[in-house]
């Protein structure tokens, strides 16, 4: 009987070990076909809140606009209204101080030391050419040029990202002009044509001459527009074709041109990139004329953005659900025909960072206006200094970060974290996450994720199975 039990226990241990091994070693092969296409594996970070203001990244800039007797209702909600409130002279002074102080070459050295190999630098159209009547001030372009030099000196690639278009392409404050729910970029041909004009200037400056010769191995490409929301898709496709053709005609270097997904489903852009054409109907003198716009797309990357905090169901999810969401999302990208990156993601498990949703707006996590969902919890636990976070909080964040690092690296051409640093929004702050042991160093130094499996969860499953088996053995012994 004893010999039988020993054999049974050995078999049980082998079974549990096999279960754990299967869980730990499971991996997706969906990117194997894509891997041969990869020329450069992106491990990057966005320089957010610098050349295009975002209130939650640098709230001090916005708070400093208040005069005696004013309240938060008098705060500007974006860069457009920041400049309008202060006037051109004062806005230029404050923005120049901001551009000078927020980033310098030391930051780019630290970015390299953190294991990153590229930066994505957002900039607005107004930094190249304003529209008549715009309150924006110029000057940020000079700091983009400095950032390219700093990147070159520290062996970092640069993606230049047109983050704001005239009359806002998405209504978000990160476009320069907040008008939630009412992006107006496509409302007038003038706005789209002005965007073409700005892109042509960008292609001319950064794709020819000095930059083409001295920085051709630094400037990896240009993203023609960030996050267009609810556009007329045929018009957006026309814009992508025309922008691409301008880029290839003007530039003397064959760098990458990035198309942002425009919040479309994964795989949406595959057929468009394969066909490289769109039929366009124009009206002239009361008569409709249909033409076909074409492009021979080469060296295109689709830029996907993914966050887990901008719906009520997401902020109510537990960490295990978030991890499963990431696995499913990345697996779908791995099946895309187009080359793709996850060009924005973060460590955020809540939308608690003050002003993340916009100046004067609350959070889904707390169910505060304008959100009407049930309260999930208190933001105080997440907005306190990360050195005061509990061990469980830090572990959960690290599990979430590790899963994204692994899955995006495995199933796409890489990733770009949003963003390098903030004044206090830790979930969005790569530098702070490194300092607090949440962002792995080196970047593949995973504690909890092994080959795409959350081992903390897998260990619990194996432990529970072992407990049940041992209980079964004890019953046999008693019998």
Swiss-Prot record:
The keyword Secreted applies. One of its GO terms (molecular function) is glucan exo-1,3-beta-glucosidase activity. It is a lipid-anchor; GPI-anchor. It comes from the Eukaryota. GO terms for cellular component: extracellular region; plasma membrane; side of membrane. Predicted to be a substrate for cleavage by KEX2. A lipid is attached at residue 456 (GPI-anchor amidated serine). It is found in: Cell membrane; Secreted. Residues 457-479 form a propeptide. It holds the Pfam family Cellulase. The active site is at residues 227, 306. Keywords: Cell membrane, Cell wall biogenesis/degradation, Glycoprotein, Glycosidase, GPI-anchor, Hydrolase, Lipoprotein, Membrane, Secreted, Signal. Glycans are attached at residues 25, 29, 63, 104, 187, 193, 254, 285, 288, 318, 451. Induction: Induced during cell wall regeneration and repressed by HAP43. Its EC number is 3.2.1.58. PANTHER family: GLUCAN 1,3-BETA-GLUCOSIDASE I_II-RELATED, GLUCAN ENDO-1,6-BETA-GLUCOSIDASE B. Beta-glucanases participate in the metabolism of beta-glucan, the main structural component of the cell wall. EXG2 is not heavily involved in the exoglucanase function of the adhesion process. Belongs to the glycosyl hydrolase 5 (cellulase A) family. This is Glucan 1,3-beta-glucosidase 2. The gene is EXG2.
